Amino acid sequence: MSEALEIPTDIKSRVSEEEWKTREDLAAAYRLVAHYGWDDMVFTHLSARVPGPDEHFLLNPFGVLFEEVTASSLVKIDLDGAVVLDNGYQVNAAGFTIHSAIHGAREDAQAVMHLHTDAGVAVSLSLIHI
């Protein structure tokens, strides 16, 4: 018999007000990306630097659709990929690779977006010559 995965939902009480606001903003950005059709299931991702002195950032959990992302489901990780605040979700490995490199190199980057828009895909496939 399999056991249900227990996902903590009380993340708000475990983070600062600044981090919670960042979580809300990033979750809203995920929802907007889904609304405009700029997502392609789990292979695009957004991240946001967590306010404060530590080099932590928030990333979508692996396997969660963009329209399902919430402030509590975002995974908080460091630049080495270690989960800083366990919320029961797994790290998006592809997202970590891209976002950790950018956040590590650019302290001024507060948010990073990696998207596959239809227009961008068409250009990358050379279907549209520019």
Model-derived segments and their meaning:
Residues 128-130:
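Conserved small/polar residues in nucleotide/adenosyl-binding loops
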Residues 1-111, 122:
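Long, non-catalytic terminal segments
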Residues 120-126:
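Short active-site loop/helix that positions an aromatic residue
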Residues 111-117:
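Ordered, amphipathic secondary-structure segments that act as subunit-interaction surfaces
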